[in-house]
Amino acid sequence: MDTGEEYDEIIIYDEEIYTGGWAATTTKLVELPSDEQLQQYTKMEIDLLRGCPDGNGGYSDAGCDEYDRIARLYICEGQCFETQYFPDADEATCIENGSSWDSEQGICFSINYIEGESLESCGEENWNYNRDCQEMSRWITPFGRQPRHLTDISPFISTLRPGGPKLFKFQESGWPNSLLTMKLRLYNETSTEPSPNDHYPMWSGTVGFNSDYDENRPPLVFEVPDDVERVEFVAYITGHGWGNNTCYNCAEFCNSKHMFSLNGGVYDFEKSFPNAASNDYCMSLEAISEGVIPNQGGTWGYGRAGWCPGQDVKPYIVDITDYVEIGSENILDYDACRVSGNSCLTPPSCGTCGYCPEIAFSSCI
């Protein structure tokens, strides 16, 4: 995809085979530019080509998954650790004390992470890259087609800093079978836009959309440094699962509202998905112009909550700079409901509904 703009490129995967069992993960350790270099960038895009290999190592739609799947890219920090062994502890005592039991060696141990150490001072053998993983990008795979997407994920420049070695982790639900090409494009634009400098993880993970949903997403406190120029809330929110006719609940083909309240109501904002009830939104010209792969099979045309099959999920970004307390703690509250007409209803429990409704949500400041 050539946009005509000049950019620097970081290659994560280059026509690499991605396969394995259900929801297999593939990882790649990448050496990133220095913090000084990263500070020059104000825009970042991710270019994904998820080709489906044929028997000759080429590309063919015939080799693609026939269903829509969630695909995610995470970037993970590295951290120094030490392993402590407890040779006198039995398995029951070990587990009771919160340690881990090595069944092959028959010994109790715990992993202790050490703050403030660099890779150089820690050493490769005591360094774990797979720590503090932040979802960086999200896609929904198409029905039986090969997707190519170019997505603006500029806020996540902050996750690259301070540079050096970082672990990228890609995971797709289902049975993966891809020739994976993934590259970051970094732009040094001559503008007054500040470069994203740091991030603070907020809510993450996939949680059942039921009467306990709000309890599983408690209010979170975050601190804003004194020297910030801009503060943004960034999130990926998509609904999945539909239950059945006896459950009166769904998260994929039904609208839901996600409500955020900053510092006790100083600023409120919300995200909803009115297109989720549409019979044809995902095959509309509007959706295709926003990145949906056309002419798929299956039920690709139905509207969904925050996504379509064969589409890159755009990050939800809200500028909250004017409403945070600079240099002190802030609190963000989050609630969600199922939208029915003009009503905002608590989603009921799923019970025996099949694919129970759930919200896949990751966010950061």
Question: What is the role of each PLM region?
Answer:
Residues 1-85, 92-98, 106-365:
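Extracellular/secretory-pathway and virion-surface proteins
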Residues 101:
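Short Cys/His-rich micro-motifs in 6-15 aa windows
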